[in-house]
Curated annotation (Swiss-Prot):
Membrane topology, record value: Lipid-anchor
Organism: Xenopus laevis (African clawed frog)
Annotated InterPro entries: Gprotein_alpha_I, Gprotein_alpha_su, GproteinA_insert, P-loop_NTPase
Lineage: Eukaryota, Metazoa, Chordata, Craniata, Vertebrata
Gene3D superfamilies: GI Alpha 1, domain 2-like, P-loop containing nucleotide triphosphate hydrolases
Family to which this protein belongs: Belongs to the G-alpha family. G(i/o/t/z) subfamily.
PANTHER family: GTP-BINDING PROTEIN ALPHA SUBUNIT (PTHR10218), GUANINE NUCLEOTIDE-BINDING PROTEIN G(I) SUBUNIT ALPHA-3 (PTHR10218:SF230)
Protein's name according to its UniProt entry: Guanine nucleotide-binding protein G(i) subunit alpha-3
Assembly, per entry: Heterotrimeric G proteins are composed of 3 units; alpha, beta and gamma. The alpha subunit contains the guanine nucleotide binding site. GTP binding causes dissociation of the heterotrimer, liberating the individual subunits so that they can interact with downstream effector proteins.
Length: 345
């Protein structure tokens, strides 16, 4: 009788484990460097957990300041390389001052002098001209977000808002894991560093992943790649997508494509033609047509079109409402494919 009881218990445990496994969703976030993966992770914390506490926000102050200072420095350095002059010659003194103050600044402190220097530089017409040519050098996406708001963030009492935190940029190294529950599912999301050297470390770790969310920065189409400057970033991203989408490890994994930074793309497409990236493109440089073309370029890489569907969404990872809406749709796809596997659909 004890044996029978024990065997019943084992059965029950196995069944519970099975149910738990069917409710556990492993999501892998992939994509080239700076495509928005970590921003999506931050949004999950804001949408599905309680967001960032005041204490956590305070800790981001250091990053906000360093992102802001690094951005203005990058623009000033590029002015030299691109031979752009200041609109007002007095700004040259401010630029020298910037380097001195930035190198001696205490972490997480923005002195009124430094804030004043940054504000005067940012408002200079030469600096703005250089900023508008940022595709020719490396500049943080959030540069104008912080620099235009320097007065607010330089105040002594400043505490970063959720949006300020979303905009911070810190290179992801290693694997960042986040857990949350949504629609009765237990999500485990893995954010993997996008820079190339990181890739070989993780590709085999993720058998049994429910879905891959692959992020692409639409606005990268006119940029050069940071790591080796040889290949356009969009082509680099397509190459990575090709290797993931057609990878033997991921034959049964749902692939969800986030064509991200749609806001920056929409802003750029009117002044930087898509032919920079796709010389054969003959459509118009409107957001709809150009975005649809990029979507086809990625979806056409799928070599198993008859058996594998790619679920594409246009996203703006810094926009909480948009991410919430898209993630809701993604979850429905996951629930549906889970039910199909269990034969319940």
């Amino acid at each position: 009788r004890e044996a029978a009881e024990r065997s019943k218990m084992i059965d029950r445990n196995l069944r519970e484990d099975g149910e738990k496994a069917s409710k556990e969703v492993k999501l892998l976030l992939l994509g080239a460097g700076e495509s928005g993966k970590s921003t999506i992770v931050k949004q999950m914390k804001i949408i599905h957990e309680d967001g960032y506490s005041e204490e956590e926000c305070r800790q981001y102050k250091v990053v906000v300041y360093s992102n802001t200072i690094q951005s203005i420095i990058a623009i000033i350095r590029a002015m030299g390389r691109l031979r752009i002059d200041f609109g007002d010659v007095a700004r040259a003194d401010d630029a020298r001052q910037l380097f001195v103050l930035a190198s001696s600044a205490e972490e997480g402190v923005m002195s009124p002098e430094l804030a004043g220097v940054i504000q005067r530089l940012w408002e200079d017409s030469g600096v703005q001209a250089c900023f508008s040519r940022s595709r020719e050098y490396q500049l943080n996406d959030s540069a104008s977000y912080y620099l235009s708001d320097i007065e607010r963030i330089a105040q002594g009492s400043y505490i970063p808002t959720q949006q300020d935190v979303l905009r911070t940029r810190v290179k992801t190294t290693g694997i960042v894991e986040t857990h949350f529950t949504f629609k009765d599912l237990y999500f485990k999301m893995f954010d993997v560093g996008g820079q190339r050297s990181e890739r070989k470390k993780w590709i085999h770790c993720f058998e049994g992943v429910t879905a891959i969310i692959f992020c692409v920065a639409l606005s990268d189409y006119d940029l050069l790649l940071a790591e080796d400057e040889e290949m356009n970033r969009m082509h680099e991203s397509m190459k990575l997508f090709d290797s993931i989408c057609n990878n033997k490890w991921f034959i049964d994994t749902s692939i969800i494509l986030f064509l991200n930074k749609k806001d920056l793309f929409e802003e750029k497409i009117s002044r930087s033609p898509l032919t920079i990236c796709y010389p054969e493109y003959s459509g118009s440089n409107t957001y709809e047509e150009a975005a649809a073309y990029i979507q086809c370029q990625f979806e056409d890489l799928n070599r198993r079109k008859d058996t594998k569907e790619i679920y594409t969404h246009f996203t703006c990872a810094t926009d909480t409402k948009n991410v919430q809406f898209v993630f809701d749709a993604v979850t429905d796809v996951i629930i549906k494919s889970n039910l199909m596997e269990c034969g319940l659909y």
